[in-house]
Amino acid sequence: MTAWDGVLPFYPQPRHAASFSVPLLIVILVFLSLAASFLFILPGIRGHSRWFWLVRVLLSLFIGAEIVAVHFSGDWFVGRVWTNTSYKAFSPSRVQVHVGLHVGLAGVNITLRGTPRQQLNETIDYNERFTWRLNEDYTKEYVHALEKGLPDPVLYLAEKFTPSSPCGLYHQYHLAGHYAAATLWVAFCFWIIANALLSMPAPLYGGLALLTTGAFTLFGVFAFASISSVPLCHFRLGSAVLTPYYGASFWLTLATGILSLLLGGAVVILHYTRPSALRSFLDLSVKDCSNQAKGNSPLTLNNPQHEQLKSPDLNITTLL
């Protein structure tokens, strides 16, 4: 046993695959902290409104967390395959590996894991990310991967998404991810506005803001789905073909958009048909919401001059 437990500290260490996205983990922890804080104060809410608040807050946090989290997820378009393929360039050695392709809004993530992991006297476990954000150079990252001598399956898939590739995947995925991310951030802004309006005596406008949230969320899904119009290149890895498909983030965002539309539509419909039930669910007082529910409010003005002359009060009522 050496001083460093058998590790040579002055030489490059074995690669370790990243197990989770740090920004995604931060988003999940933030919204889980908000949910936990609300659950701590939930026993202080009296009566049946406690359960109304529970459903309302948890649904709202779920929608907000999902809209933010999918920006950092790489599961919008995924593909997995087990294959026997070459491992390094200029080498006849072949390995049995599991290859994963994960396309997100900001880039592509390629995983390579040996089955078993120990093959050719080394551990085969790679997780490489290539980004196409506005301030990132995908080609430069790909050239850097070539210089590092990454395995052939990783370089093969990464090359398919380069700007110079005849597949044309880079431009389509780059634009689709850019517009999808932009519309989802707009949806998140309307989600904040909807929560603010639903906490005030303005449930109608809160419902409209929630409808807008769902609309922009679906716009983001449709923007990313536009990639299906591009003929997909065949990803042939050794003896197998990798066939990508829409991943969990895509379907979860689609479900969130539909949920936002349903909730927003329910708020608008209840505002006109069952305003008392809507007030009970939102825990708003009758006095605060009566003016908006009726559509007009009486304004009564007393004339002080008639009181001085001891004449009957003159009430002026104006309907606004």
Swiss-Prot record:
PTM: N-glycosylated.
An individual GO BP term: hydrogen peroxide metabolic process
Main location: endoplasmic reticulum
Assembly description: Heterodimer with DUXA2; disulfide-linked. Interacts with CSNK1G2.
Pfam families tied to this protein: DuoxA (PF10204)
One GO molecular-function entry: enzyme binding
This protein's record includes keyword DNA damage: no
InterPro entries membership: Dual_oxidase_maturation_fac
Role noted for this protein: Required for the maturation and the transport from the endoplasmic reticulum to the plasma membrane of functional DUOX2. May play a role in thyroid hormone synthesis.
Extracellular face of the membrane: 73-183, 228-249
Keywords in alphabetical order: Disulfide bond, Endoplasmic reticulum, Glycoprotein, Membrane, Protein transport, Transmembrane, Transmembrane helix, Transport
Segments traversing the membrane: 22-42, 52-72, 184-204, 207-227, 250-270
UniProt keyword Transmembrane helix present: yes
Record gene name: Duoxa2
Protein name: Dual oxidase maturation factor 2
